[in-house]
Amino acid sequence: FLGAASQRTKKIRLGPLVYVLPLWNPIRVAEEVALLDNLTQGRLECGFGAGVGPFTFAAYGVPWDEKRKMAWEALRMIKGIWDNPSYSYEGEYFKCKNVELGIPLVQKPHPPLWMPTRSRESLEEAASIGVSTIQWVPPRMKVIRAAFDQYRDAYQRAQPAGRKPHIGLMREIYVAASDKQARDEAKDHWIYFWQRRGGARAYGGYGHENLTTMLDGERKKELLDIDHSITDGSFISGSPETVTRQIQEIASKAGADTFLGEFAFGALEHHQVMNSLRLFTDQVMPELRKFEIDALNYPKAEPQVAAT
């Protein structure tokens, strides 16, 4: 897909989110990313992850319980291939000998790297090497903010060299002419999306929480209530003015400097997705460009004091 998109676009940055590294040969990933960086003429962003569900790992015969160690070992090997004219490596899970990358990267030292993660170990490791982090919907905002604060602390301690990483929030989004139109058109698709995704075998685990179990309780009720989801910022929906305000609010609560929108969800028709995208591009993006957050130096959330 990215290869095709690279030849039909000129300005937009493109990227996978994510390569599930335990399921890939690191040499293949290093070469493919280098090729895509050339095809996009340096417009590539690259997302890496350890995986979100054991079902896919079972299909590949890869141990789910060792995914985190495998992912970080694979990333070390990939970066080693990018950084050296000839590279050899022997680890617990992967090895290579005298690998020469035949495709020079356009972006130096490599394309910007992203990793969605919430475990303390992975957050700190990502921050320590300057890999950007991103969070998606299922956790409540207080969990996301705590994760971002951990990331910021680790980054400030490590002060890694190179380009500064970003802190991102990803949300499903639907923009229409009015708040009512957006809610009415998106409601069934939002509910369908969570009913399908919450029970899917491939999404049997998310971070250190079981997504299916989590969605069986209070959080599932919250997410299946479209009005609650819009109010608490789990779902971005409304007129261009409302959507602009919603994104600014959740970015401020989280201390995030990047927003990723998933415009196609549920069973939305193509024309609905495109209309939402056009409204976002024409009316929301110009306003968001005026809104900036220094995510890496964002003040830490105040501790909550229980009422007595």
Functional labels for PLM-detected ranges:
Residues 2-11, 33-44, 124-128, 156-162, ...:
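Acidic (Asp/Glu)-rich catalytic clusters
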Residues 65-101, 142-256, 285, 289-308:
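An alpha-helical appendage that flanks or caps ligand/catalytic pockets
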Residues 1-14, 108-111, 298-308:
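N-terminal beta1-alpha1-beta2 module of alpha/beta enzyme domains
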Residues 5, 36, 78, 113, ...:
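Conserved, mostly hydrophobic/aromatic
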Residues 1-16, 70, 74, 280-292:
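Alpha-helix-loop-beta-strand connector modules within alpha/beta enzyme cores
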Residues 14-16, 44-48, 113-116, 133-136, ...:
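Hydrophobic faces of well-ordered beta-strands that scaffold small-molecule active sites
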Residues 119, 123, 127-139:
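A conserved active-site cap/scaffold subdomain adjacent to cofactor or substrate pockets
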Residues 22-89, 93, 133-134, 139-143, ...:
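Flexible, glycine-rich active-site loops centered on histidine and acidic residues
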